[in-house]
Amino acid sequence: NSRLDTLQAAVLNIKIKSLSKWISNRKKVANNYLDLLEKNSFIHLPKIDSENVSHSWNQFVIKLKNYNYDINNDYSELFETDVNKNNSLRNLLKLRLSEKGINSIIYYPIPIHAQIAYKNKNFSREKLINTERVCTEVLSLPMYPEISYEEQVYVAENLNIILKSCINELQICA
C-alpha cells in the first residue's frame, strides 16, 4: 500500500492545479503526431472511437507489425527487446531511433501470462494470441507536455526515414 506523506501531499496539491493544462498540452502533442505520421502505412496509430472518451495521452504508442511472430516461439525469444536477440521491425526501429537521439520506450514487453510469477498457471496461449502479438509490436514515442512541435517533426521525419530503411534491411514486403 502506498500512502502520501505530508510533503508529497503538499507537492501534489500544487501540481494538481496544472493537470488540466498538462492534459490539454498532451492532446495537442498527440494530434501533432497523428498528423505527422498518418501517411505511414507501416504504422498503426492510436485512435479514439468516441466523442465521449477523453484520453490523457500519458503515452503515445504506435504499433508495428511483427513479421517474426510465431505462437510456437519460446517466450524467452518472443518477448526479447534486444535487437541482437530478436531482430523484429519494432526492435530495430527502437535501436535506430536511439542512434538519432530519439528515446522510445517499450512499456509492457512481456504479457502477464508470460511472466515468471504466472508460469504454472497453464494459460492457453491460443486464447491470448492478440495479447502476445501486441506486446511484440508496440513502441512509445517521446510524449510530454513540453515537447515542441519542432522536436515532434524531428521525431516523425526520422521515424519515417528510419522505418523505410529498417523495412529494406529486414526485407519486408508490404
Task: Please provide the spans of the model-predicted regions.
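PLP-dependent aminotransferase class I/II
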Residues: 1-174
